């Protein structure tokens, strides 16, 4: 029996990494996918059928600058590509959200396609209100990256000064790394632990 509420203990557990066998259940709860599933049922079959009438487009990558799919096994990559096309066909108003493909790929590592779909759709719905998980336009994304640069400047001046001494722009580094959850630049278990907290607490954990 699933408990649809996010407890403090769940948040704490996520910070240390959710056990593999619990990720499917906790991601479904924390993303709001379970609640949406109880409200509208399994919408994957209808969404997939509708997407079959929509021409494939590069837009289905949601503006992703670094293609995480190249780091996945070919079979998984094809699965994610098809999944993203269906998702984009139902959310064509999103013009730029490069984090979405990475989140989709990570959800599909642990979830069946219908559950991953209802989970990420719930995350998109919540983000329309307050960008909790995703920025949904290019302007929102660039503003969040700029805010990250200002935060580093304020909270970690040594890091900021070191970056400047190397002629590096912290905001541009964030622009490159955030959409892929630092993959493939950190071990997958570490990235998954970060993702655990992201699903529960939103994109603020990336800063």
Where are these regions (language model features)?
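Internal, helix-rich recognition cores of eukaryotic regulatory domains
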Residues: 1-207
